[in-house]
From Swiss-Prot:
Protein name: UPF0304 protein VIBHAR_01542
InterPro entries: UPF0304_YfbU, YfbU_alpha-helical_sf, YfbU_helix-hairpin_sf
SUPFAM superfamilies according to UniProt: YfbU-like (SSF116960)
Pfam families recorded: YfbU
Similarity remark: Belongs to the UPF0304 family.
Amino acid sequence: MEMSNAQRLILSNQYNLMSQLDPSNAAKYKRLQTIVERGYELQMRELNKDFGCITETECREIIDIMEMYHAMQESNKMLDDEERGKVDQRRLQFLGFDIATEAQQVHYVRFLVDSEGLYPQFDKADHHFNSQMPMLDKYRRMLKTWRNCPRQYHLCANELAQIFSA
């Protein structure tokens, strides 16, 4: 993150004020203030992590992934008991993304569910959409398979299995 000296001074003052307003997090704000004041470039990258950017294309891809899971869950509900028995029910749960490598995607999913109220049927589980393993490539393969299905919102057990194994 490139900042002018004036910007660094303003941010330093804000961290100083935050440390006074929020004593329980004072050590955190003092640390960030020191990083900004002294210009530690490596640590200043930490400041960037909260100011990510997801393109419109990436946002639409995440929504498509969530919509695919919604379609799979709804399709599963429409199956008769025999067909439903062939579907691994655990794989119908949307796990989210890996917070370590796909943080922006995790935050966007949380925004969609928590702030926008979309997909309330998705179980946040204990990890709140942190799959704890990279998922984006897997989801992309699943999306490709799902998009090739003729009836995307009325999938049979075989189609669900194909999507899961993509």
